[in-house]
Amino acid sequence: MKNYVIHDLPDYFKQYKKSIKNPKKFWDKIADENFVWYQRWNKVVKFDMEEAKIEWFKGAKLNITKNCLDRHLNLRGDKTAIIWEPNNPDEEAQHISYKELHERVCKMANVLTELGIKKGDRVCIYLPMIPELAVTMLACAKMGAVHSVIFAGFSASAVATRVNDCEAKMIITSDGSYRGNKAIDLKGIIDEAVEKCPTVEKVLVVKRTNTDIKMKEGRDFLLDDYYPKASTDFVTKIMDAEDPLFILYTSGSTGKPKGMLHTTAGYMVYTAYTFKNVFSYRENDIYWCTADIGWITGHSYILYGPLLNGATTVIFEGVPTYPEPDRFWAVIEKHKVNQFYTAPTAIRSLAKESSEWVEKHDLSSLRVIGSVGEPINDEAWHWYNDHVGKKKSPIVDTWWQTETGGIMISPLPFVTPTKPTYATLPLPGIQPVLMDEKRNEITGNQVDGALCIRFPWPGIARTIWGDHQRYKETYFSAFPGKYFTGDGALRDEVGYYRITGRMDDVIIV
């Protein structure tokens, strides 16, 4: 991200002020200087908050996979793009270079094409955390198919609900997955789900556990039968800025899952920019986010954000407590991880174990540690800061949502002074406001209210797949002219934000 790294606090305030005063100019420059476009946009942003219609970089032509892979081949072809750390520590890790990842993605795109997938088709992906998960997502994006990743822990009925909602033509799954000392029959779950999915024509099966599985003739296809002979050349599809990139379902606390639709250009620009700044990423760093790719954190900060920056990203198949409760710390030491991004749930459960599990590992490579998924409580923050960060690596306590596409409020390492349990300050381009129950904006500090965002940002989801009315009502009706996050927040005496929890049942007087 040329010219857009924030170096210190005065620089943050300067950039932030610029981004609020003239958001169009701010994002125009970032998009122009840091990405490869087939054609430039004729309008930076166009929006109607009442109708919940938002468009960024309208008129632009691009492909996100070209920006994640192809453009790095000259300078970073031999650099490791993905380090895959398997569930079992005795199994060898894979180091996949940008060149090899590009070849794998082209081969996969050719396989999908051979099996009848075209631009605009929806492909559901139900895979464990194996390299093929990243490869299939990037292949879909390269060929213009819309991926919808379903977390490989969901039941057959949860899978069927999501597959039917987006009318997927294909499901990509594996024979099974490993979780700790258990092998799980993923193909069996998909067989049950597909019985209720009339739009699914084909199921593509990746081998992982090599267990015996039933294959239905004419519907089920083994990747191994197609992949070896597939070409490593594939003509990248040229996409419009607002073409769908992926649908990701968020359960939320009420009603059926919402298929959040993210589009190509805005999501690309926002995830790349936020990754670079929030994790203080430098050229040869090793970055590890422990989330599952089935969640938005994995989409934005395991796959797209890091690869857009030419980074090395770790994909971990296992769990934090297998074979012992020091697996996270062992992986950090083994791969000399510089940035580590995990959830408060994991931090709390690992904090219950003896601190000897952490102390026995060399974590000196760590420079930044992060938290995501929910507000981190005071005790967990201090344990993480003291034992993992050794009081040297700043904690980036990030607030964002499936709907926002990328991080919205967060400290920037070595820039923003941290404060336990506070997400601190908004990133450039993000205008948080607190609202009261009478829909009035609450000004000043030491106040709390409903957290809304005043102006659109490039990463915002554009709609709920197939139900724009629900999107409008959920996010834009409670506080007209603003995006309502569904969260409450407080603003302290210096303007730092702390998320106080969900407000889904907010009553407007």
Give, region by region, the residue ranges found by the protein language model.
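Conserved AMP-binding/adenylate-forming core of the ANL superfamily
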Residues: 65, 82-138, 155-160, 215, ...
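N-lobe entry segment of adenylate-forming
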Residues: 1-96, 100-103, 107-110, 189, ...
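Gly/Ser/Thr-rich phosphate-binding loop
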Residues: 308-311, 338-342, 351-420, 431
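ATP-dependent adenylate-forming carboxylate-activation enzymes
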Residues: 127, 148-164, 176-185, 266, ...
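Conserved pre-ATP/AMP-binding loop-to-beta segment of ANL
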Residues: 78-80, 204-205, 216-249, 256, ...
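Conserved ATP-binding/catalytic segment of the ANL
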Residues: 443, 452-509
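ANL superfamily adenylate-forming
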Residues: 89-90, 170-241, 353-354
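Conserved AMP-binding/adenylation subdomain of ANL enzymes
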Residues: 268-286, 296-339, 353
